[in-house]
Amino acid sequence: MKKDTRKYMIYFFGALGGLLYGYDTGVISGALLFINNDIPLTTLTEGLVVSMLLLGAIFGSALSGTCSDRWGRRKVVFVLSIIFIIGALACAFSQTIGMLIASRVILGLAVGGSTALVPVYLSEMAPTKIRGTLGTMNNLMIVTGILLAYIVNYLFTPFEAWRWMVGLAAVPAVLLLIGIAFMPESPRWLVKRGSEEEARRIMNITHDPKDIEMELAEMKQGEAEKKETTLGVLKAKWIRPMLLIGVGLAIFQQAVGINTVIYYAPTIFTKAGLGTSASALGTMGIGILNVIMCITAMILIDRVGRKKLLIWGSVGITLSLAALSGVLLTLGLSASTAWMTVVFLGVYIVFYQATWGPVVWVLMPELFPSKARGAATGFTTLVLSAANLIVSLVFPLMLSAMGIAWVFMVFSVICLLSFFFAFYMVPETKGKSLEEIEASLKKRFKKKKSTQNQVLNERTL
């Protein structure tokens, strides 16, 4: 097999877990329309069917990070692919609401695990020059999975075949299981375990030959300086600001409302006045736009930088949601405002998927030292899943109590807050190796802590 072919297969299969996450997230919006035909649903149980995936994801995120730091990225991907298959088939063959909810929890374990692990694996496999571009592949796979789910829902809706909708998630899961044969272990994890020659062999596939020895030297130097355990690193005071930034990124990525659009797009369009068929087309349009803008982000992220994209993204999503809310508040619901809803949500998707959607997945693993990258990324992904769960549970209640216009106004205020967070808190990591980022952040936050201590000592004297 040619070197370039092997390299692209590594990247493709490394990111495939993102497609499964996207599919399992998006498919439930169509399946919910017909589950009630076989399994009676109440308002409560319908909410549980959606949200239990996210509950499972919280635990999956926490477990996969620590496990991948201990046993390696590749072995954990193998386990996750099996859980994906079991969860998808269990959902398809569920006969009671209890079985369906339990199956969604199992599926959520794999969803959360892949959400935490895929960005780490891609960031550690990528050469510095294209790490941002490659890191956005995770989000590209997520939105591609969502689009596939929308298409499958559309195709199977005439047959009311919800079991096929959810069960087809097993197909890419089997593909991931096969693809593990092409996925080597992360070179950084191997260096951490003392397997330098194996790391060099893998980097010969993925890296420019002239950069290999320099990057290996950086990895070895970084590991030589790390005598602490994973838990010890996470407890270190200098890493707390990094964790807070990671947690902030995770919360804002979800709190600006993206998954309410993914989960409830048909409901939003129907509330805004569109018919069933038009709502389905509008939803599919959002799925296509997701993919297009994520590809745009892949082109921009290593040229423009992470921080600038987040800042401009916050401006765009704030204005689009505020404008949408203003139109609905002043003009009410009509045929014209229904299509304006589609347009403004489209603008929102353009800005979100070119910025906050993919950039957060790239930044989270970049922020943390290699000794604790899996565990720290797992923790921030846990927070992301929890924020996703809270927003998805609260959205229907807000929609019922406030109306769609005021709901979008609330999200626009949160988007405005994300601007200040990105501007003042988020560091730029473009063009730096993971070891350079770690050294820079450690110096920045240790220096800040040292300055604070000096001021306190002077005041005491």
UniProtKB/Swiss-Prot annotation:
- State what protein this is by name: Probable metabolite transport protein CsbC
Briefly state the protein's biological role: Could serve either a nutritional or an osmotic protection function.
* Residues exposed to the Extracellular side: 36-38, 98-104, 161-163, 263-280, 330-341, 400-402
Similarity comment: family membership: Belongs to the major facilitator superfamily. Sugar transporter (TC 2.A.1.1) family.
Q: Where in the cell is it found?
A: Cell membrane
| Alphabetical list of SUPFAM superfamilies matching this protein | MFS general substrate transporter (SSF103473)
MF term (GO), any? D-glucose transmembrane transporter activity
Task: Classify the main location.
Answer: membrane
Task: Name the lineage.
Answer: Bacteria, Bacillati, Bacillota, Bacilli, Bacillales
* Entry annotated with the keyword Cytoplasm: no
- One GO cellular component term, please give it: membrane
Give the membrane topology. Answer: Multi-pass membrane protein
A single Gene Ontology biological process assigned to it is: D-glucose transmembrane transport
List where the protein spans the membrane: 15-35, 39-59, 77-97, 105-125, 140-160, 164-184, 242-262, 281-301, 309-329, 342-362, 379-399, 403-423
Sorted alphabetically, the keyword list is: Cell membrane, Membrane, Transmembrane, Transmembrane helix, Transport
| Record topology, Cytoplasmic segments | 1-14, 60-76, 126-139, 185-241, 302-308, 363-378, 424-461
What CDD domains does the annotation carry? MFS_XylE_like (cd17359)
Q: Record's Pfam families?
A: Sugar_tr
